[in-house]
Amino acid sequence: MILSIESSCDDSSIAVTETSTKKILYHKKISQEAEHSCYGGVVPELASRLHAVALPKILEETKPWFDKLKAVAVTNQPGLGVTLLEGIAMAKTVAVLQNIPLIPVHHLKGHIYSLFIEKKTLFPLLVLLISGGHTQIIRVKDFEHMEILATSMDDSVGESFDKCAKMMHLGYPGGPLIEALALKGDENRFDLPVPLRNSPLIAFSLSGLKNAVRLTVEKLGGAEKMTEQDEADLSASFQKAVKLHLLQKSKKIFAKEPIRDFAIVGGASANQYLRGAYADLCREFRKTMHVAPLQYCSDNAAMIGRYAIDAYEREQFIDPNEIDIVSTKKQQAGMLL
């Protein structure tokens, strides 16, 4: 069994996974959305304090499996430094006290492995990762080789949803709020720009679109004067522009990549509008689409545990005294995760 810990942002999560069957024996997540909502986004120091309270409570519930643990896994990159530290400190303590190996896990690799929770892996695979911190298309050849084909030049998909929701005073997290409002809106009312539409670059950029939303809010008299229909129409128009941007760049990669299996992962992959758009794109290019179960789209320890099983089989351990937060360089196309 492997104990896995996730604390890269605002979700405190711990799981226990059986190594041989890959079955989840225990999984719990405590979200901090309510505490951060009034700020319109995650406050790192507050998140760290909340992790310090939540993680020990969850860990206490995993005590029945302690004697059977073979390893402990923890996210150590990328993420908020002060929140990663909480999970790492706990993992080091468990590893030392139980005298078991420690497995560091890259958070984005964990998201990819959310596809394989309680399942066998499927490689090779093209993956669109859309979350609060990242927007990337990754070619996953196997466990060892994951190459970034396209990445964001600025704001991620999840971040842009959150910031646009904040501009309209909708609340946090913005993704589900904008998606729900968009169902009642006219996506053609506001002519928002599709980023990099005329650029040959195979990359993502949402800062310009975000600014266009800000200017539209101002033209409507500010968030306070917007009607519910204004909010719905702007949400729908924004979501449509994001979709068109993602699809345009994805098509260029689909056209030259022979890999037949494609997946969407990350918190923003729960968006049903975007899922539907990519289902259509996969049919057009005759690719098979895969998605993680909705409960495993956002940050969770189950995906960290699933990745850790494959790492454990390859004996990718680290001395508990040597693990630390890894400073992640700005990721570019061509780089390996």
Swiss-Prot record:
Keyword Ligase (UniProt): no
Broad class of where this protein is predominantly found: cytoplasm
Binding positions for Fe cation per the UniProt entry: H107, H111, D299
Cofactor(s) recorded in Swiss-Prot or TrEMBL: Fe(2+)
GO (cellular component) term, any one: cytoplasm
Keyword match Acyltransferase: yes
Keyword annotations of the record: Acyltransferase, Cytoplasm, Iron, Metal-binding, Transferase, tRNA processing
Residues where substrate binds: L129, I130, S131, G132, G133, D162, G175, N271
Any single GO BP term: tRNA threonylcarbamoyladenosine modification
Pfam families named in the record: TsaD
Cofactor binding, per record: Binds 1 Fe(2+) ion per subunit.
Function: Required for the formation of a threonylcarbamoyl group on adenosine at position 37 (t(6)A37) in tRNAs that read codons beginning with adenine. Is involved in the transfer of the threonylcarbamoyl moiety of threonylcarbamoyl-AMP (TC-AMP) to the N6 group of A37, together with TsaE and TsaB. TsaD likely plays a direct catalytic role in this reaction.
Protein name: tRNA N6-adenosine threonylcarbamoyltransferase
Record organism: Sulfurovum sp. (strain NBC37-1)
Organism phylogeny: Bacteria, Pseudomonadati, Campylobacterota, Epsilonproteobacteria, Campylobacterales
Underlying gene: tsaD
